[in-house]
């Protein structure tokens, strides 16, 4: 089974992806994690990507698609793609690569739909563990140690630090989603991401079960 999950910033893609790969025994390919790892390497590419991310702009398709192709070469056709594709061009690329490698396309597309104001509030308060990638809200999580892996490396993401960049990312997401919804019509599961984590998980699993019948 090949699943892709996307949604606006703050919609809980990473959280739901972690739960889904455990539930369905899938390999995870997270574009966001790949980019953050490159940024932390301080390479020339990392510096270039960091500048793009901090301004709220999208990374060039050529870079994203190259990273994805490399990752797909390492997994079989039981995987979940977190945050990819982000536009119609990337969707066409993904179809081409999957057809070449597995003679198939994506099976299920999960879209997490989130109110913009809630997204902004979540991003302003988001705190991430640099080691296990667990996410917390600074308004409710007061510890300096990650509850999951006990790391003390808790930080705000660089792309959450600037309000104008946040607004730009959300606007760009809505703009790109129009074409993606049409492209994946028939495979698209729309989920209310304004709900609690458990409620969102239940809705996703219920709709996936119905889709697999």
From Swiss-Prot:
Signal peptide: none
Highest rank taxon of the organism: Bacteria
Residue sites binding Zn(2+) per the record: 129, 132, 146, 149
Record's catalysed reaction(s): AMP + ATP = 2 ADP
Region (NMP): 30-59
Compartments where located: Cytoplasm
Documented EC number(s): 2.7.4.3
Gene Ontology cellular-component terms listed: cytoplasm
Entry binding sites for ATP: 10-15, 126, 135-136, 195
MF annotations from Gene Ontology: adenylate kinase activity; ATP binding; zinc ion binding
UniProt similarity note: Belongs to the adenylate kinase family.
Domain writeup: Consists of three domains, a large central CORE domain and two small peripheral domains, NMPbind and LID, which undergo movements during catalysis. The LID domain closes over the site of phosphoryl transfer upon ATP binding. Assembling and dissambling the active center during each catalytic cycle provides an effective means to prevent ATP hydrolysis. Some bacteria have evolved a zinc-coordinating structure that stabilizes the LID domain.
Protein name: Adenylate kinase
Species of origin: Wolbachia pipientis wMel
Gene name in the database record: adk
């Amino acid at each position: 089974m090949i699943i892709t999950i996307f949604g606006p910033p703050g919609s809980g893609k990473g959280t739901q992806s972690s739960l889904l790969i455990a539930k369905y025994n899938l390999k995870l390919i997270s574009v966001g994690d790949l980019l953050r790892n490159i940024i932390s390497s301080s390479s020339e590419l990392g510096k270039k990507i960091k500048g793009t991310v901090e301004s709220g702009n999208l990374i060039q398709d050529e870079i994203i698609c190259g990273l994805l192709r490399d990752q797909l070469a390492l997994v079989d056709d039981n995987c979940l793609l977190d945050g990819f594709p982000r536009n119609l061009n990337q969707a066409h690329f993904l179809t081409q690569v999957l057809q070449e490698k597995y003679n198939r396309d994506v099976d299920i597309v999960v879209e997490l739909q989130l109110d913009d104001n809630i997204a902004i509030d979540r991003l302003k308060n988001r705190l991430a563990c640099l080691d296990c990638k667990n996410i917390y809200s600074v308004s409710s999580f007061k510890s300096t140690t990650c509850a999951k892996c006990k790391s003390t490396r808790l930080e705000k993401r660089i792309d959450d630090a600037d309000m104008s960049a946040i607004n730009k990312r959300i606007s760009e997401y809505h703009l790109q989603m129009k074409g993606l919804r049409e492209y994946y019509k028939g495979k698209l599961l729309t989920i209310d991401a304004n709900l609690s984590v458990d409620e969102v998980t239940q809705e996703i699993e219920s709709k996936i079960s119905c889709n697999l019948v």
